[in-house]
């Protein structure tokens, strides 16, 4: 297969912002970056993160997860300057049940689904639908037997909304694996229209 052919098959994410993480999950050396598709340039927008995860960009606002300090932060994104301005925490870190990981917007964009990665010795996992305006938890999902919820994906079909959750098993101690038999499973939650 030619190089040009492979490139033609690649799908690009329209979100021009991505984050990095410290592999040891201990030091705030990660950052949020902007990728300019036209110039193919990358520039740092905001540093000092430990594990930049879920993102949602809409109408000049960016919601970003930094997992280790347990923050879900809203920023004003100035695309002309390529700058981020922190505005507020969506919810206080102490209110979050575990480490926030992946995030996806719900239809309409007024709330997001947040998946929580729990490294503790617990059996079940949690994900929440959080209203962006005030941090209120609208829906809580319990994923039985799988404490490390990583990535939600929201699908709309025939007027109904479904949420898919991926979960992790990598690095899970055997004693936790014994009480979490569904770790690594994909879960589906159907929501009413």
Where are these regions (language model features)?
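Glycine- and Gly-Pro-enriched alpha-helical subdomains that act as flexible
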Residues: 56-79, 83-87
């Amino acid at each position: 297969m030619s190089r040009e052919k492979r490139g033609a098959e690649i799908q690009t994410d329209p979100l021009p912002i991505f984050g990095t993480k410290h592999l040891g999950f201990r030091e705030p050396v990660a950052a949020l970056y902007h990728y300019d598709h036209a110039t193919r340039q990358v520039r740092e927008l905001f540093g000092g993160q430990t594990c930049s995860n879920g993102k949602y960009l809409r109408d000049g606002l960016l919601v970003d997860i930094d997992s280790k300090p347990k923050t879900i932060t809203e920023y004003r994104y100035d695309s002309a300057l390529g700058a981020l301005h922190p505005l507020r925490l969506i919810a206080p870190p102490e209110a979050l049940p575990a480490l926030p990981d992946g995030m996806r917007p719900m239809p309409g964009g007024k709330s997001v689904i947040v998946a929580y990665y729990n490294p503790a010795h617990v059996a079940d996992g949690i994900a929440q639908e959080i209203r962006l305006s005030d941090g209120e938890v609208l829906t809580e999902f319990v994923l039985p037997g799988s404490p490390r919820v990583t990535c939600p994906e929201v699908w709309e079909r025939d007027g109904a909304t479904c949420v898919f959750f991926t979960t992790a098993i990598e690095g899970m101690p055997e004693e936790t694996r014994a009480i979490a038999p569904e770790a690594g499973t994909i879960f589906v939650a159907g929501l009413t229209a």
